């Protein structure tokens, strides 16, 4: 995913947190904020230190990024959102990660209504 699709600055993370629009499941928490003037979505990924060591945290981030890349055409475009991994996300398989992410994104109403898992 290109850098223009990422949220990196702490101030931008805080702005999304402060909207308090969140949904969660066992593996992920998603915070979202509408940005109507924005041409495409932006995402921030956070994996805390409760999830293993740096290798495990980066592994989880790669799984999240790949799942979002596959879901990109179906995601709502005028929004900033954060995906926060919970400790239960450690060791999750790619298919389970995508399934869990689809579930939480549907709860947050960030996926197109016509999306169905292949």
From Swiss-Prot:
InterPro entries named in the record: Ribosomal_Su5_D2-typ_SF, Ribsml_uS5_D2-typ_fold_subgr, RNase_P
Group of enzyme by EC: hydrolase
Any single Gene Ontology cellular-component annotation: ribonuclease P complex
Pfam families membership: Ribonuclease_P
Reaction equation(s) it catalyzes: Endonucleolytic cleavage of RNA, removing 5'-extranucleotides from tRNA precursor
GO molecular function terms noted in the UniProt entry: 3'-tRNA processing endoribonuclease activity; ribonuclease P activity; tRNA binding
Biological process according to GO: tRNA 5'-leader removal
Assigned keywords, A-Z: Endonuclease, Hydrolase, Nuclease, RNA-binding, tRNA processing
EC number: 3.1.26.5
Subunit composition and interactions: Consists of a catalytic RNA component (M1 or rnpB) and a protein subunit.
Protein purpose: RNaseP catalyzes the removal of the 5'-leader sequence from pre-tRNA to produce the mature 5'-terminus. It can also cleave other RNA substrates such as 4.5S RNA. The protein component plays an auxiliary but essential role in vivo by binding to the 5'-leader sequence and broadening the substrate specificity of the ribozyme.
Family to which this protein belongs: Belongs to the RnpA family.
Protein name (record): Ribonuclease P protein component
Source organism of the structure: Levilactobacillus brevis (strain ATCC 367 / BCRC 12310 / CIP 105137 / JCM 1170 / LMG 11437 / NCIMB 947 / NCTC 947)
Gene name of the encoded protein: rnpA
């Amino acid at each position: 995913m290109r850098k223009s699709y990422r949220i990196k600055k702490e101030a931008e993370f805080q702005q999304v947190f402060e909207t308090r629009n969140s949904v969660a499941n066992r593996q992920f928490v998603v915070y979202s904020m509408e940005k109507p003037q924005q041409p495409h979505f932006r995402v921030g990924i956070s994996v805390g230190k409760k999830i293993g060591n740096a290798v495990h945290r980066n592994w989880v981030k790669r799984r999240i990024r790949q799942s979002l890349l596959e879901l990109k055409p179906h995601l709502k475009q005028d929004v900033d959102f954060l995906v926060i991994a919970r400790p239960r996300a450690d060791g999750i398989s790619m298919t389970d990660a995508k399934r869990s992410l689809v579930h939480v994104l549907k709860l947050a109403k960030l996926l197109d209504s016509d999306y169905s898992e292949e």
